[in-house]
Design a protein with these regions (language model features):
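Short cysteine-rich clusters marking metal-coordination/redox-active sites
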Residues: 3-6, 25-28
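Short linker/helix segments within small regulatory modules
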Residues: 13-22
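Short metal-binding segments enriched for Cys and/or His
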Residues: 29-48, 52-63
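Long, low-complexity, charged/polar intrinsically disordered regions in eukaryotic proteins
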Residues: 81-160
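Positively charged, polyanion-binding regions of nucleic-acid-associated proteins
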Residues: 152-173, 204
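A short acidic, leucine-rich amphipathic alpha-helix
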Residues: 177-179
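Short, positively charged loop/turn segments that connect secondary-structure elements
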Residues: 183-199
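Charged low-complexity interaction tracts in eukaryotic proteins
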Residues: 197-224
Length: 224
């Protein structure tokens, strides 16, 4: 597998002293975690310890995530990449701690809520056994890298508003369409006193990064 970040022809298995990574690019030092599942990915995928995951995504050591799907015959069917800068605590679901009778009693795992990550933040590398053009994958990675935000709070707002825009079932939409999600966003961001202003701020950011186009008079067009 090549590196989708820099185009290096082959990424290597990560050293044993990198517990959060399965693969690493020796050219750009990008690290990758691999999760595999038989059949459809569904809305969530099991990951490791909850506390470790939260610590990872709020630090600089979080890897990009490869999601591999395979058939009952162990043939690879799909491969999807989610860059590390689209992970926020809200998409990490805490699982029940293991029972006292379990080998790792009290251990708390987590699930990654894939349904909380906008489709624009997912890059298809293989679709139904069809390998996507390498340069297209690299270009897609470089394009969505424009949405990278270091602040976890602002990153969460970006994903929330981008999810709202994606769920609007038309290519051209207006500001009022996004305001329909105000109540939902207010419940999620209870300390924010001006959700509509935050929506406008995120729409401007998404527009500036080339994912939507402003048509004037509160109207927008999706560019994805």
């Amino acid at each position: 597998m090549y590196c989708p970040n820099c185009g290096n022809p082959k990424i290597q298995r990560a050293d044993n002293n990198k517990p959060v990574a399965d693969f690493q690019c020796n050219n750009c030092d990008q690290i990758f975690e691999l999760k595999s599942k038989n059949g459809s990915l569904g809305a969530k995928i099991v990951d490791g310890a909850y506390s470790t995951m939260i610590e990872r995504i709020t630090s600089a050591s979080n890897p990009d995530l490869f999601l591999l799907q395979y058939s009952e015959n162990y043939d690879i069917t799909d491969l999807t990449l989610i860059p590390k800068f689209f992970f926020v605590p809200d998409i990490i679901e805490k699982r029940k701690q293991l029972a006292l009778t379990a080998k790792r009693a009290g251990w708390v795992g987590c699930n990654i809520l894939l349904c909380g990550i906008p489709e624009q933040c997912k890059i298809s590398v293989i679709i139904k056994q069809l390998i996507q053009n390498r340069q297209d994958v690299i270009s897609s990675y470089n394009r969505i890298k424009k949405l990278k935000i270091d602040s976890i709070d602002n990153r969460g707002w970006l994903l929330d508003v981008l999810n709202c825009v994606e769920s609007i079932d038309k290519r051209e939409f207006c500001l009022k369409d996004v305001y329909e999600f105000t109540e939902k966003l207010q419940k999620k961001h209870i300390h924010n006193k001006n959700v509509e202003a935050k929506i406008r701020q995120q729409l401007q950011f998404i527009r500036d990064k080339g994912f939507i186009e402003f048509l004037g008079k509160g109207r927008y067009r999706k560019l994805f």
